[in-house]
């Protein structure tokens, strides 16, 4: 269909789903992850990628949304998800055998129009059928990249039409022989880099300790790409083991940054209350 942008078709406010982190919602510029778009979250191992997605699912469910989790890594922990506020009994969970099956399920969920958010964990685990049925040591050059490229070509139109948020979790690999620039790259070829409206780079910045006991990680997220607001903004928050994102700690940090809360040494004060 062809439309004339003469003002009769007003640009509606972008619908978003909160990430569960106030700082990251602000860094994204629109208040969360945009619906009707593809989002990629990537980073090293144990950096908080799945935790961030589960926090976002919990926020979506709080607002009455329907969510699906495609667990290609076969590592979904319902006990941990429940601790983060996810209503596991209301979550659609799939653990597919092949990459083709995972992406077909994703396409079916999106086309149904009955799901608000779909998470695919992870792109690296989307193994093509030919590779699974082949022998160990067989070479399958570019198979996964072609699979992702074909799937995203099919998906994007349906995603926009049904206003579904699709989040792909991705892992980092090292390029061999890179002298200048970063040797890091993400798996699954270049298609996802192009189709994603938002790309988030999540990293551990340090540890949170109480004596010798490690309670969690200081986490830094950089918005590498953003088609809906200015990119390259950053957010920092704490992820506590078994609890998820520390909302209270983040709120205090933002309050200090904007001179709403006074910090003096280890003391915080607000309106003469310490």
From Swiss-Prot:
GO terms for biological process: DNA recombination; DNA repair; SOS response. InterPro entries: AAA+_ATPase, DNA_recomb/repair_RecA, DNA_recomb/repair_RecA_CS, P-loop_NTPase, RecA-like_C, RecA-like_N, RecA_ATP-bd, RecA_C_sf. This is Protein RecA. Can catalyze the hydrolysis of ATP in the presence of single-stranded DNA, the ATP-dependent uptake of single-stranded DNA by duplex DNA, and the ATP-dependent hybridization of homologous single-stranded DNAs. It interacts with LexA causing its activation and leading to its autocatalytic cleavage. ATP binds at residues 43-50. One of its GO terms (cellular component) is cytosol. Belongs to the RecA family. The gene is recA. It is found in: Cytoplasm. Pfam families: RecA (PF00154), RecA_C (PF21096).
């Amino acid at each position: 269909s062809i439309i004339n942008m003469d003002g009769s078709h007003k640009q509606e406010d972008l619908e978003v789903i909160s990430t569960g982190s106030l700082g990251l919602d602000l860094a994204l510029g629109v208040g969360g992850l945009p619906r009707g778009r593809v989002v990629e979250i990537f980073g090293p191992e144990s950096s908080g990628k799945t935790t961030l997605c589960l926090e976002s699912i919990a926020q979506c469910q709080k607002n009455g949304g329907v969510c699906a989790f495609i667990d290609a890594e076969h590592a979904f922990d319902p006990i941990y998800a429940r601790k983060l506020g996810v209503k596991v009994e209301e979550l659609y969970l799939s653990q597919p055998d092949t990459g083709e099956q995972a992406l077909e399920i994703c396409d079916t969920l999106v086309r149904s129009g009955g799901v608000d958010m779909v998470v695919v964990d992870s792109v690296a685990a989307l193994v093509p059928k030919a590779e699974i049925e082949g022998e160990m040591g067989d070479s399958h050059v570019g198979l996964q990249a072609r699979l992702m490229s074909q799937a995203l070509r099919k998906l994007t139109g349906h995603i926009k039409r049904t206003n579904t948020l699709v989040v792909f979790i991705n892992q980092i690999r090292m390029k061999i022989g890179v002298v200048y620039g970063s040797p890091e790259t993400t798996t699954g070829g270049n298609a996802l880099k192009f189709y994603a409206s938002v790309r988030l780079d999540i990293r551990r910045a340090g540890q949170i300790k109480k004596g010798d006991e490690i309670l969690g990680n200081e986490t830094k997220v950089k918005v590498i790409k953003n088609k809906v607001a200015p990119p390259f903004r950053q957010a920092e928050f704490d992820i506590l083991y078994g609890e998820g994102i520390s909302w209270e700690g983040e709120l205090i940090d933002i309050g200090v940054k904007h001179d709403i809360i006074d910090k003096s040494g280890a003391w915080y004060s607000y309106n003469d209350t310490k």
